[in-house]
Amino acid sequence: MPSENFKADQGMLFCFAKEEIKVFWMPDTRFNLDIFFLGSDLTVLDIERNLPFYRGFANPQKIPRTRPIKAQHVLEMRADSPLAKKITKGMKLIWLHSKDLNQTISNAHLSQ
């Protein structure tokens, strides 16, 4: 999704098969990000708030990154999102989609 279409009430959920150390960065954004590191049950394990934006892909070494954090899933939201500001460490997020999250993740990893 182009970053200019990324609304304050939206997020991007990155799902992984196992919990391990993650470092996130988002080149070519036009707004700062709040990045939520989640356990397998979607409990917020850690948060990186207000990660600075970086336009383009030039000079990858200059693109801001999170510190290394152990997590299974990662949620990115705009740092200026009122919803993101309400999410705190220890909070458990709830998956509301009609398909089970674990089954969705399993199917996605099988198709890769």
Per-region residue spans from a language model:
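Compact, glycine-rich, soluble single-domain proteins
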Residues: M1-Q112
